[in-house]
């Protein structure tokens, strides 16, 4: 199933006049296991570059950095054997780099402050890339295929796949079934308590 990332910030864009190397940041948390298939930075005139990071626990890894020119918006497609395979709960972080100076020929007048908006003279900050949602079984299968494709050996680090190093993971390790059962038990307990209270009345 196709998965869009909803990764960006259209409210807090504050680009100061006549200043280069300004940064914008946005985060999202993956609600399902995903295999990322594309990276598509979308900025406006001051945009110079965008980087995408994956954060899993205390592990932070840069997945992609790409230059940006608003005259030619590009989509970058990951090769199948390098596409990031990320577990549910991974934090995705994008950083946008802005140049609001005369050195940036796309900016009509760098003396002006710039905020958010849909016009080219205002700004957007979005990763429009997409991915594929993975079930628990598909997630484990994708990691095993990646290990075989790169001739993985114990101790090897796999860029963009924080759990690939654990070749003994099972569905129970990556599944939410235990959490769902616990939630169901809690709901049943609440219902039983309510029924008992009603009977006592």
Model regions and ranges:
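Ser/Thr-rich, Pro/Gly/Ala-heavy low-complexity intrinsically disordered linkers and tails
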Residues: 179-200
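Beta-strand-centric surfaces of beta-sandwich/beta-rich domains
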Residues: 1-173
